[in-house]
Amino acid sequence: MSELITLSTQYAKNFLDEAAVRERAGAYAHLIDEARAGFLNDWDSAGWMRLFEHTNEASIRRMEEKAAEIRREADAFILIGVGGSNNAARSVIEALVPDRTVEILYAGNTTAPSAIERLLRRMEGKSVFIDIIAKNFETLEPGAAFRVLRRYLYETYGTDAARRIMATGTPDSRLHRLCRENGWDFFTFPETVGGRYSAFTEVGLMPMAVMGVDIRALLGGAERMQRHILGAAAEENPALLYAAARTLLYERGYRAEMLTFFEPRLAWFSKWWIQLFGESEGKDGRGLLPLSCECSEELHSMGQFLQQGSETVLETFLCTAEDSDGPALRPDGLDDGFAYLDGKHFADLNAAALGASMRAHSGHLPCLQLCTGACSEETFGALFQFFMLACVFSCRMAGVNPFDQPGVEAYKRSMFRALGKEG
C-alpha cells in the first residue's frame, strides 16, 4: 500500500550497524504485544489505540453534518487551541486544503496582544464560527482567547451567537457545563487520550471536516498502518526499527534529531512531530531534542551545520512520493546558464536535491530515511499512527513515560501563581 512507511538505514551505515538495529528491535518485541493489547498498563492514556471506540459511525456523521452547516454559512472558522489541541488538524489542513471557501484562523496559541488584535480585525464583516478545544479547560491561552471571541460573537450576532460556538472537551467538565447552559454544540475530548495523541478523535477530526478533509480516508490510513505495525515481526517492523535506531544513536552520544523534508506541505506536520517527541520523550534528563528542517530552502542555512557542525545530530529524512512532476523547464532562447535543466521537471530537481543532501550529510552524521506515499488523507493517517506508536516504543526503550508532561505542568503552576490564580 502506497501510504505505508518504510525505513532505510543505508545512509547511516557509517554510524549504525543494521544488524544491531534489528537485534535491538528483537529485544523489544514484547512492545508489539503491549501495543496489540492496547497498552493495558496505560489504559487511561492509550485511548488513541482504540481507533473507533471514540470515533464511531455516529460520531463521524455528526461531525460531517456540522461541518457541512459551517461551510454553507461561514466566511471564517476559528480554531481555538494550543499544542496538541490543534497541531494535528492544522498540519492536515495546511497540507491538503490550499483552496478554501471558508477561511480558517487560529487562536488560543499565543498570549501576544498583537495576535489577538490582528485576529479581531480579520473577523470584521465576516460570518464567523468558532471551535474551542480544551481537555480540562484550564490552559491559559485558549481560555483567554475564548473569552474575547465569544464576547465578539455575542456582541455581533446576539442570540444567534450560540449556534456559532462549538466546544470540544471532556464530558462533565466545566466546558461541558457551559455548553449545556448556553446551547453550544459539544464534541468529546476523550479522557483516555492526551492532546498530542488526539488526531483521530473529534479534537482533530472536527476542524479537518469543516475544511473539507476526508476524515474517513484519514482514519482508514491510520487503521491500515496500525494493523501493519501490530502484525509485523519485530525485526521487520518499521516503527520498532525506527525506535531502535534512534535509541542506539542516543546511546552513542547523539542528542538531537532533525526531521528533514523536501515537501513544504509537511511544515506544520513537523511541528506536530516536534511536540509529540519533545513532550513525550524529553524528561528525566533524557531524550533527543526534536528539530525540523524544511528543504530545499534550509539547505542554505541548516545544511551547513548538518555537514560540518557539531557531531551531536542525527537526521531523519521524511520522504513523500510526488503527486505531480510539476512544470517542465524549457529553453526560451536566453543564455541564462541553466541549459543543463532543459527538459527536466521540478520533481527531477527535488529528487536530485534530496539525494545529494543524503549523500553529503551522511558523511558527517547518521541519516535515517522514512519513505511514504504522496500527501493525502490516507498518508497523513498512516504518518500520525506510525509516529505515535514509534514514539511510545522509543519512550519504553528509554524508560520514560510517553504520556505525561510534568515539566509543562510545572511551568503552568508558576504562571498561574504570577497571574493570581488560587489553588
Describe the residue ranges of each PLM region:
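Hydrophobic alpha-helical scaffolding
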Residues: 56, 106-109, 135, 139, ...
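Glycine-rich phosphate-binding loops that contact phosphosugars or nucleotide phosphates
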Residues: 68-232, 413
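Short helix-loop-beta junction
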Residues: 94-103, 152, 276-287, 360-364
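Acidic catalytic cores of enzymes that act on phosphate-bearing nucleotides/polynucleotides
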Residues: 52, 213-216, 229-356
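C-terminal amphipathic alpha-helical interaction region
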Residues: 400-423
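Flexible loop/turn segments at secondary-structure boundaries
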Residues: 85-88, 113-115, 138-141, 173-176, ...
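Glycine-rich phosphate/diphosphate-binding loops that line cofactor/substrate pockets in enzymes
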Residues: 42-43, 62-75, 118-128, 245-255, ...
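Extended, charge-enriched "interface" segments that sit outside catalytic cores
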Residues: 1-68, 332-340
